[in-house]
Amino acid sequence: MTTRQAAHSVAFILLTVLVIFASYYTVFGLKGYESTTLIVSLALAFLLSSLISFRTQNTERYPLSLISFSLILFLGWAVLGHFYTVDQDNSMTAILRHFGGAILLLGLSLKIKEEEHLQRFLWLALFCAGLMSVIAVVQQFEVFSAIIPKTFRNMSTGFYGHRNVLATYLLLHFPLTIYFYFSSQTINKKIITGIMPILIVLALIFSRSRGGQLVLGIQLLCILVYFVQMKDHSKVRDFFIALGLITALYFGLIYLIKLSEVDQYYSTPPAITNVFTGELNAWQNLANRLVFWETGWGIFKDYWLTGTGSGTYELLFPMYLGKETSGLVEGFAYVANPPHSHNILIQIATDTGVIGLGLFMAFLIAVYSRGIYLLRNAPPETRNFVFFLTLSLTGFMIHNQIEYNWIQIHFIYPFVFLVFALDFMDRKYSLKKSSVKKINSLIHNGVLTAFILVGTFSTVNYYKYQALIYEKIIPGTGVANLLMLTNEAKTYCPGCGWPGLEMTKNLISQYRRNPNPAILVSAETELKEVALLTPFNLRQFIYLAEIRSFQANWDEAKKLYVQAFKNTKMKALGGCRIFSSNPDKC
């Protein structure tokens, strides 16, 4: 086997593994940092093998298109958040995942040259979505509990553990399953692709995700209007036949569920007509989201230019809660601190500022302007593909106006893959072959090599830092060498505050055993450094309050506790450390 053939095979194997892992990462039982490291490593290896295959083939370089160029600009700005984030500990995972998305897009641009290859991997992605739908439906019967998670209040979640996450994933793939059904030429493919959309609709119904069901309705309406506009009566007929079949299957499954021994949280299934009443009514969720959105607006106003860095919303939320939401915050303030703003545009604005939001909007404009161009000028079959592809991306974006299932659950990778598919069709069928001029060969190869080197260095550093923090420092397995471990962690992430916080925690523990004032001085010195690195991490106030308590400075200790308890997690931590017989376990 030649080098070119080996690189070609390895690239496709890596892409296959990446597509499967991005959909089923929860099944592998990896910790968050481990799954992030693995998927970014797969993207890096895919880019490297694609570059080797590309260079040995001596094929003509694709020009950098408007869609891919605008997305890489946005992802690049998010990666630069390393330099403007208010907390590197909270941002480093999201930054690396943004980098992984850019790396995947570059690898796809190098490797996928044939529409046949693109269709093959789309088939794989849709098969993964169909299988997830089967799992979501089977969840209702609570069988195979060793491999299929139990539902929460009869709400299907797939392997994701949350109904809205499942809904986002399925909505991203649903329209394409319909396209592949109508475009399939063999009976076997038609049967498989005919089953997939039915399963996805049933899974979305059983998920009880109101937002997901609403977006599904919008997608179905768009598809029906498209078929009517095409005057394709056979497809309109098939559309209504499928809806009838789904209805029959749904009530049949409900009947079987009632006959089973599954404990039902509801005496009757929640009806879509009860969207504004009952326990799962939309008003409470909407009120919560208004708080999230207005709090995000408050953060954006203070950090409007560059934002606070990816993944920092949860950290700043307690500091801004109530400033912008005085009329909504009552009864909410101490319920939960959300991990994100539940809106992709607000989240991008708070994370990356007006610069990042502007780049993302430019990317969306590029996607829809080129999509509209293809719908008007491409051959008929390509127009169909572009319509359903654009509808998939649109469904994802609409659902993410009330969610933010993008970075924290690896959905950036299937999103990037579908964006590339549209980009591929644009490059193939546009009369104007390039919106951006071709790049010099030396610069082209140099930039890609730099991406690989920087990505590899960043991924290795990230893994080493996270492994030290979560495997040795926080669990206390390396207490004897804690100073050495924290110093090593600081070399991997000089701007991170967690090593200093853990060192402070250890010094306070030492003081409890040996009340030496010098130990408190050392602990306070660590906290001063932490305050410079991560000023919004309220854990430092818990530790500083303990130091002030040891020093009998009760007034200042009380003020520090009050400030820290704005965060519900810190309230629980502070209570545990005050009342527990072993505060080091808190």
Go through each PLM region and give its residues.
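Structural motif corresponding to the intra-repeat A-B loop/turn of tetratricopeptide repeats
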Residues: 510, 514-517, 551
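Membrane-interface anchor segments at the N-terminal boundary of transmembrane helices
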Residues: 27-45, 340, 347-363
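Transmembrane signal-anchor hairpin modules in multi-pass inner-membrane enzymes, especially those
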Residues: 1-80, 86-93, 100-127, 179-194, ...
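Interfacial juxtamembrane loops and adjacent helix segments
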Residues: 144-157, 263-287, 299, 310-350
